[in-house]
Amino acid sequence: MCGIVGYIGTNNAKGILLEGLEKLEYRGYDSAGIALQNKELVTVVKEKGRIADLASLVPSDAFGTTGIGHTRWATHGKPNHENAHPHQSKSGRFTIVHNGVIENYTLLKEEYLKNHSFVSDTDTEVIVQLIELFAAELSTKEAFKKALSLLHGSYAICLIDQTNTETLYAAKNKSPLLIGKGENFNVIASDAMAVLKETDEFVEIMDKEIVIVTKDGFTLETLEGEEITRASYKAELDASDIEKGTYPHYMLKEIDEQPAVTRKIIQAYQDEAGEINVDKTIIDEILSSDRIHIVACGTSYHAGLVGKNLIEKMAKIPVEVHVSSEFAYNLPLMSKKPLFIFITQSGETADSRQCLVKVKELGYRTLTLTNVPGSTLDREADHSMYLYAGPEIAVASTKAYTAQISVLAVLAVSLGREIGDEEALNINLAAELGIVATAMEAMVSSKEVIEHIAGEYLATSRNAFFLGRNIDYFVAMEAALKLKEISYIQAEGFASGELKHGTIALIEDGTPVLALITQESINWNIRGNVNEVLARGAKTCIFAMENVAQPGDRFVIPQVHPLLTPLASVIPCQLLAYYAALHRDCDVDKPRNLAKSVTVE
């Protein structure tokens, strides 16, 4: 949610900021703005809408060798020009951009700024007015630090001072921010992807640290004034990794990348003997626990449900799955030695991070599954396993979901082998995941079939239902989430046996009902449920795996191992959502109101 780019150097910052903000569009936003500092003149341009709208408003001759940019996802105040960032202090001396939520901003207004008039409804404007207030008696750095010391909540901040054209200031707490190093310039960004074109060398900023940046270098300090030395690291990404190439949308590109991601996971976790294995310290840690708690949000939560099924079957350890935003405020009854697995694509999800902090305070051990090495949850967990999915730019997650399930399968089989589980010992997971990758390739080559189904069933529908049983139910929930995210159809996934306990009342003539069937043991049970809604006027569609497919099924899913069926059955569901969104003329990669990386609670 939201994104920050800052630049200080010798070149014009305008293009660097606008291009950087474009690279951060995936994070979700409703308005955007930049500030350019040329000597002692600061030009601010901001507006509700897309980066393209902002770029059209920036004067062609706008110039500044120092600048800050921001994409905003509204938390305080409506999405409009006044609430868009950057914000300026009353005199115009200070200009600021901010990600996060300041929980005590109304109290700070009352205590320090009672006589100030405010242009916006944001918490951010309070910060910049405080800095100006304190700067009447303190240096900019000390005024900044004093303001930061009063803030309760999360923030990533970038600040420029009209009276000091040679310096950029930044700070963070519970919201991602990093420094990019260059020759005769330095950059600040929420995500390395924003500035990969400028540099591939980065330094992390940790919580409650500030950084004073010039074109020649930077100084890291704690709020107490202690200087910090921290090594830089090279980004593993290349600028080409985050381009669409010949694809019309990132989402379609990322759906197509899933076979390659699956094979990359095989390689990453395969030992010299060709066996799939997980670090022994992780295995021992998990097997010494008496209960596993998986904590995740959204798509990652759905992957966690599949993970529960796999781990309980293989490792014989009870597993509970929790929604992050609920877990932190309603801790379950704890066993004697629980272990917590956090699943997060970005590694920055605020709700999940809050849960991780809480369980670590209680002394429990933690494991993070993330796609971003070096992210907050990666750094703060006791152990990490990586997804190897590469950058996922589209807001709706596709390849990260299948990567999460693949890595959970790797973990489950490794645990099962360690305890001598017969099924785990007998499965050649590398080979079976290879079969999954081949099945994925076959399905992404059948796009025209799914496009036709999407047009027939969903182009004009107001709602849709997905049905499944057992492991197919978990995929039905994910399929419904994908559809509602990008096509704005009210879609829900249900355990098909629960239809007659209430949901069937919503079925009327023409209601689209899509059923997923991959398990022989429950094939006819689900088909019976499909007949129940068909008898009440529903327009039904069945996606079935080869071993259970019947004449009349609309799409046949290639056969894969029974434990890995979600990896295959979700592919046509992702494509269905994609083409439904196209038929409805929706913004596939940047759906309204949504953010890729949810960094506020």
From Swiss-Prot:
Alphabetized SUPFAM superfamilies for the sequence: N-terminal nucleophile aminohydrolases (Ntn hydrolases) (SSF56235), SIS domain (SSF53697)
Gene3D superfamilies: Glucose-6-phosphate isomerase like protein, domain 1 (3.40.50.10490), Glutamine Phosphoribosylpyrophosphate, subunit 1, domain 1 (3.60.20.10)
UniProt keyword Oxidoreductase, yes or no: no
GO biological process: carbohydrate metabolic process; fructose 6-phosphate metabolic process; protein N-linked glycosylation; UDP-N-acetylglucosamine metabolic process
Active site per UniProt: C2 (nucleophile), K596 (for fru-6p isomerization activity)
GO molecular function: carbohydrate derivative binding; glutamine-fructose-6-phosphate transaminase (isomerizing) activity
Residue ranges of domain SIS in the record: 282-421, 453-591
Domain Glutamine amidotransferase type-2: 2-216
Catalytic activity annotation: D-fructose 6-phosphate + L-glutamine = D-glucosamine 6-phosphate + L-glutamate
Biological role: Catalyzes the first step in hexosamine metabolism, converting fructose-6P into glucosamine-6P using glutamine as a nitrogen source.
Oligomeric and partner information: Homodimer.
Protein name: Glutamine--fructose-6-phosphate aminotransferase [isomerizing]
Organism whose genome encodes this protein: Listeria monocytogenes serovar 1/2a (strain ATCC BAA-679 / EGD-e)
